[in-house]
Structures are given as structure tokens and as C-alpha cells.
Swiss-Prot record:
Keyword annotations: Antimicrobial, Disulfide bond, Fungicide, Plant defense, Secreted, Signal
Annotated S-S bridges: C43-C64, C48-C73, C52-C75
Keyword match Acyltransferase: no
Main location: secreted
Signal peptide feature range: 1-29
Entry's family note: Belongs to the DEFL family.
Origin superkingdom: Eukaryota
GO BP: defense response to fungus; killing of cells of another organism
Protein name (Swiss-Prot/TrEMBL): Defensin-like protein 204
GO cellular component entries: extracellular region; secretory vesicle
Length: 80
């Protein structure tokens, strides 16, 4: 009984790891198109992400990045 339970746990764990490893790169790979800048001053990561979602509905991430000497909130998304 313990051997069967151990085998089921290992198989389940393997399937979960396989599912996670294939889905994460797909979602991040589609989020590389620059959509524009969002007005967040000073730029904070959480605020940048939420403002990007407000301004660009198909934004999947917002990052604070240097643009010249200033930090700006850049919004990224994908087009289907």
C-alpha cells in the first residue's frame, strides 16, 4: 500500500512540475512587446504594474526602467 501511494505521489509531482515548466515560459514569452509608458512618479514596481493595466488593457507587465537618467514605467504586453 505504501509503495503504491509513493508511486502515485511521485507521478503527481512529476506531472505538476512538467505542467508548470511548460506554461511559465509561454506566458512570459508573449509579454515582450513595448506598449508605452505609464505616468508613475516615483516609479515603484507594484504601482507601475497596476497603472499599466489601467492604461493598456492587454498589458501583462510593467517595469521600472532607466530611460536616459530617469526611471520610467514601461508597459509590456502582447498582441493576439
Amino acid at each position: 500500500m505504501a509503495k503504491t501511494f509513493s508511486s502515485i505521489c511521485f507521478t503527481t509531482l512529476l506531472l505538476v512540475v512538467l505542467f508548470i515548466s511548460t506554461e511559465i515560459p509561454k506566458s512570459e514569452a508573449h509579454c515582450d512587446h513595448f506598449l508605452g509608458e505609464a505616468p508613475v512618479y516615483p516609479c515603484k514596481e507594484k504601482a507601475c504594474k497596476s497603472v499599466c493595466k489601467e492604461h493598456y488593457h492587454h498589458a501583462c507587465k510593467g517595469e521600472c526602467e532607466y530611460h536616459g537618467r530617469e526611471v520610467h514605467c514601461h508597459c509590456y504586453g502582447d498582441y493576439h
